[in-house]
Regions:
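Nucleic-acid-processing active sites and adjacent nucleic-acid-binding tracks
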Residues: 1-27
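Short glycine-rich phosphate-binding loop at a beta-alpha junction
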Residues: 25-36
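Long, charge-rich intrinsically disordered scaffolds of nucleic-acid metabolism proteins
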Residues: 45, 52-168, 172
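Short alpha-helical scaffolding segments that buttress acidic/His motifs in well-ordered protein cores
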Residues: 101, 169, 183, 232-237, ...
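Acidic, carboxylate-rich catalytic segments that either coordinate divalent cations
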Residues: 246-292
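Phosphate-backbone recognition surface of nucleic-acid-processing proteins
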Residues: 11, 183-261, 265
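Short Gly/Thr/Asp-enriched flexible loops that form oxyanion-binding sites at enzyme active sites
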Residues: 38-45
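Helix-hairpin-helix
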Residues: 165-188, 200
């Protein structure tokens, strides 16, 4: 197997694309590397190349089963072998609006976390020595968040598809503007007919995995997934199960039924999260708003 190494810059990207076209490679298998792969994936997609971004958990399990040492060359071989044996198909889709929305929303999440930390520091500022500095930073962060909100709204207003998604999501009880933007930013698969509700639950990390063997039935568990949309759904369900928000009767009924059947309360909460996600997914697919 031939091994080549390219720099992660414009020149390296051009060399890689040239080699791919010369060898008529059908699909490129890529491992997520914390965003370092984003630029080359975009360029490959713009050059009409088929790209598959592997699931890190699945690939790591496959990689460990091969019992090979850890080098760049071996890692490249593992990716190629994994793609061949698993018969992977393209799953990478680049859309300018979705990517822009995701970056703005991610930056907003970072600033909100910083703002929360600064408010805690202000609360514990006993003698007020650092109070003025903290208050200045809090005001700056609030202005930056407001500016990002404007940019997020501009991106959504420029796309009819995103506007429709946000409108449908906001019609669902408990899904306000903030949560709706989080879902469409970090879960672009939402409403896509190529994804079932179970697959979407697995992507978010709220799908139950069995652990059975013979006559033994182990406890189901959840793992992995995208943290920001999962956290957003969790907070909405916590409010809904207590009847805090109007229109949440269907979730409260599900929660009460599971708890009355002696299911652990956290199991009932996760089940409600899946139900809420399924409702959002189906409504966007059918292009209709929630009706109480």
């Amino acid at each position: 197997m031939e091994y080549n190494r390219f720099s992660n810059d414009k020149l390296g990207h051009e060399e890689l694309i040239k080699l791919i076209k010369e060898q008529e490679i059908k699909i490129i298998v890529c491992e997520p590397t914390g965003g370092y792969e984003s630029e080359i994936c975009q360029e490959l997609y713009n050059n009409k190349q088929q790209i598959h971004k592997v699931n890190t958990y699945s690939f790591n399990s496959f990689s460990q089963s091969m019992n090979l040492c850890k080098t760049d060359k071996k890692d490249a071989f593992k990716l190629a072998y994994y793609g061949d044996k698993m018969q992977l198909t393209a799953n990478y889709l680049y859309q300018v609006e979705s990517e822009t929305l995701k970056r703005y929303q991610q930056r907003r999440e970072d600033l909100v976390l910083m703002l929360s930390n600064e408010k805690k520091r202000l609360h514990h500022s006993i003698d007020g020595i650092d109070k003025e500095s903290i208050e200045k930073l809090i005001k700056f962060l609030q202005n930056e968040i407001a500016e990002l909100d404007k940019k997020l709204n501009e991106v959504i207003d420029e796309s009819e598809e995103l506007k429709e998604k946000v409108k449908i999501l906001e019609s669902v009880p408990g899904i306000g503007k903030c949560v709706g933007k989080k879902l469409i930013s970090f879960l672009p698969e939402l409403g896509n007919k190529n994804y079932s509700s179970n697959e979407l639950s697995a992507i978010v990390g709220i799908a139950p995995y069995a652990r059975d063997s013979g006559n033994k039935q182990g406890r189901r568990f959840i793992r992995g997934g995208r943290k920001i949309p999962r956290d957003a759904l969790y907070m909405e369900v916590l409010a809904g199960k207590n009847g805090v928000k109007n229109g949440f009767q269907y979730l409260k009924a599900l929660y009460d039924r599971l708890v009355n059947n002696y299911k652990p309360k956290k199991v009932a909460v996760v089940a409600c999260m899946r139900k809420l996600l399924e409702v959002c997914h189906k409504l966007i697919q059918q292009k209709r708003c929630f009706v109480i």
